[in-house]
């Protein structure tokens, strides 16, 4: 798993992102997710999602701007039997 530590003091998901949302959505238009082997639970919707959702640029735009439903997503994962979580 590749990662990069970000120099931020808090989560974004706010109106401060409005100026970049169009460009961000355009950048996401080329994404191509493949079917996964384990469920992915969206912190945007608190539902299990598949590659068709992950391939929608508008999904990522909304994900950048809308509130995170972290607790609800963890509850869904727990209901599905998960006991270890990776964010």
Say what each PLM segment does.
Residues 2-87:
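Acyltransferase
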